[in-house]
């Protein structure tokens, strides 16, 4: 009669060991869940960035305003008849 409770206790201990320390244990599950959440956040950020780049590409294909804006900012475009002013911050 004493064998059955001991056998059940050993079985329970083995199952608990696998649950906490074995392959696919609870700590591994928690770590994987955290990793998935971080990856989902990174995917959301990259999706937003991709959408901005797609909009920028579409604007460059369709409109000349974006091309002119880039030429002014990156290449220093000044049209004929325009005067360029640069305002520097005061040094104090």
UniProtKB/Swiss-Prot annotation:
Highest taxon above the source species: Bacteria
InterPro entries xrefs: Cell_div_FtsB (IPR023081), FtsL/DivIC (IPR007060)
Membrane topology per record: Single-pass type II membrane protein
Main location (coarse class): membrane
An example Gene Ontology CC term for this record: cell division site
Keyword Amino-acid biosynthesis (UniProt): no
GO biological process, one term: FtsZ-dependent cytokinesis
Cytoplasmic side: 1-3
A Pfam match: DivIC
Cell compartment(s), UniProt: Cell inner membrane
Residue ranges that the Swiss-Prot or TrEMBL entry lists as coiled coil: 31-74
Keyword tags: Cell cycle, Cell division, Cell inner membrane, Cell membrane, Coiled coil, Membrane, Transmembrane, Transmembrane helix
Periplasmic topological domain: 22-92
Keyword Endoplasmic reticulum listed: no
Membrane-spanning ranges: 4-21
Family label: Belongs to the FtsB family.
Role according to the record: Essential cell division protein. May link together the upstream cell division proteins, which are predominantly cytoplasmic, with the downstream cell division proteins, which are predominantly periplasmic.
HAMAP family from the UniProt entry: FtsB (MF_00599)
Record-linked NCBIfam families: PRK00888.1 (NF002058)
Summary of subunit composition and partner proteins: Part of a complex composed of FtsB, FtsL and FtsQ.
Name the UniProt record assigns to this protein: Cell division protein FtsB
